[in-house]
From Swiss-Prot:
Annotated source species: Salmonella newport (strain SL254)
Subunit structure: Homohexamer. Interacts with ViaA.
PANTHER family assigned to the protein according to its UniProt record, in alphabetical order: ATPASE RAVA
Pfam families hit by this protein: AAA_lid_8, ATPase_RavA_C, bpMoxR, LARA_dom
Gene behind the chain: ravA
The protein, known as: Regulatory ATPase RavA
Free-text activity regulation comment from the record: ATPase activity is stimulated by ViaA.
């Protein structure tokens, strides 16, 4: 078997070749290729004339030997037009009911059925068996169907509670396509002279029958780690608890997990990673409402839980809370304390400075810097006599901010613990302390916890960086996940600097 990274590179080049000349269809091609390489079915929803059939035709060129069958369903379509006409010779000579399947669905590797919901019950029932069991009953015999990819298309969804729901449930990947939107792409499409029937894939990239069969075994060997399973189960529980969530059968979950295994395998990994779960957004929706719902739920999962983002923020919140507790304890110990005076009949308490304060000026540190009079202040210098007068009689108090300039009016008070508290214009306050008593350093306990948390963040970011190279995931998702991780990292760094 090829080295995993070489295989991933080959599949990437194969997809690029298939995408040539198709504008704004890269994601659809890649998911159809993934479906073809893992033997799954795709439903394309969109208006006529947006290259749905061309996507299916292109996928034939992914293989060295692949026969294609395509058919436009109508209300009058018959099984003979899809599965082959009856053999008149066999019926006449031997009385056998047998179809001539050459050139029809039972002998095709790539199948495209347009306007699928117009098919009648006879076609639908046979098609269900073909998809489920990859077998076709031809008269008295069961014939194996080589179908690797079924692409069904329509410009509408099946009606709810109709006989079509069973077939719709078999369409694992569901893609909602629209017209070309970008101006430059629209122009390129208009002037393109590419022949749609040309094979754009070099022979060296095409998949042989032997490779395809071996890969089916290899896909099944891809592991599902416990943390990834927990994410899947969390998503399932979230959907079960939402009133408007689509019903997802156990069969559909199981088939979706195999698709995730295929995504991991063709990305060069030996285990399903959280990044692969984004594919579920194209597997679990039923209609427009549930499509938006799946997008929202997966975004919550990917940006909040897949790489422990929310768990790390919760831990950070606990660390910050503990730090505040320690700071409060330290603040109580180091805050400058005045002496309460006055008899029991005094109208208001008054205070005096401690006897050890004897200098004509007194500089006190803010335990937490504040912005006062448009200045970031870390200490205030008071005239001792002015401070004593304020402590005794109240009124206005002034001090030099950071010890410079003219003395400025301060919003200051004595709290219940007899500490001096200064407040800014928003009434945020901090206690004052004598120089040499304020504790500036972060407690060792908090430092260690923040270091451990930052190391855990680095590990999660490294995991994401190693896993993000997935051909089948749109780059927009990678950007949102990276932003969520960077936000967590920034909050941790800010906490370390405080």
């Amino acid at each position: 078997m090829a080295h995993p990274h070489l295989l991933a590179e080959r599949i990437s080049r194969l997809s690029s070749a298939l995408e040539k000349g198709l504008y704004e269809r890269s994601h659809a091609i890649r998911l159809c290729l993934l479906a073809a390489l893992s033997g799954e079915s795709v439903f394309l929803l969109g208006p006529p004339g947006i290259a749905k059939s061309l996507i299916a035709r292109r996928l034939k060129f992914a293989f060295q030997r692949a026969r294609a069958f395509e058919y436009l369903m109508t209300r009058f379509s018959t099984p003979e037009e899809v599965f082959g006409p009856l053999s008149i010779q066999a019926l006449k000579d031997e009385g056998r009911y047998e179809r001539l399947t050459t050139g029809y669905l039972p002998e095709a590797e790539i199948v495209f059925l347009d306007e699928i919901w117009k098919a009648g019950p006879a076609i639908l029932n046979t098609l269900l068996t073909a998809i489920n069991e990859r077998h076709f009953r031809n008269g008295a015999f069961e014939e194996k169907i080589p179908m690797r990819l079924l692409v069904a298309a329509s410009n509408e969804l099946p009606e709810a509670d109709s006989s079509l729901e069973a077939l719709y449930d078999r369409m694992l990947i569901r893609l909602w396509l629209d017209k070309v939107q970008d101006k430059a792409n629209f122009r390129s499409m208009l002037v393109s002279q590419q022949d749609e029937s040309d094979n754009p894939v070099p022979a060296s990239l095409q998949v042989s029958d032997e490779e395809y069969q071996q890969w089916q075994k290899d896909i099944g060997a891809i592991s599902l780690p416990d943390p990834v399973f927990e994410l899947i189960f969390t998503l399932r529980q979230q959907l079960d608890n939402l009133p408007n969530a689509p019903y997802v059968s156990d069969r559909r979950w199981k088939k979706a997990i195999r698709l995730l295994q295929a995504s991991a395998f063709f990305s060069g990994r030996d285990a399903v990673a959280p990044i692969d779960l984004i594919l579920l957004k194209d597997c679990l929706w039923y209609d427009a409402q549930s499509l938006n719902l799946m997008q929202q739920q997966l975004e919550i999962l990917m940006t909040g839980h897949a790489w422990q983002q929310q768990a790390m923020l919760t831990r950070l919140g606990g660390i910050v809370q503990r730090r505040l507790q320690l700071q409060q304890q330290q603040s109580d110990k180091t805050a400058f304390t005045v002496i309460k005076e006055g008899g029991m009949f005094s109208r208001r308490p008054h205070y005096t400075l401690p006897p050890e304060v004897s200098a004509s000026t007194l500089t006190l540190l803010l335990q937490k810097p504040l912005k006062l009079h448009d200045m970031e202040v870390i200490h205030i210098t008071f005239d001792r006599s002015a401070l004593e007068l304020w402590l005794t009689k109240g009124g206005e108090i002034r001090g030099k901010l950071n010890g410079i300039g003219f003395a400025q009016t301060l919003n200051m008070e004595v709290d219940n613990a007899q500490h001096l508290v200064v407040r800014d214009i928003s009434l945020q306050g901090t206690r004052l302390a004598l120089p040499g008593t304020a504790e500036d350093s972060m407690p060792a306990e908090i430092k260690q916890q923040l270091e451990t948390l930052e190391n855990d963040w680095r590990q999660q970011h490294t995991r994401f960086s190693e896993q993000q190279h997935c051909l089948f995931i749109h780059s927009d998702w990678l950007g949102r996940i990276e932003a969520s991780l960077q936000d967590v990292g920034e909050q941790i760094r800010q906490a370390k600097q405080c």
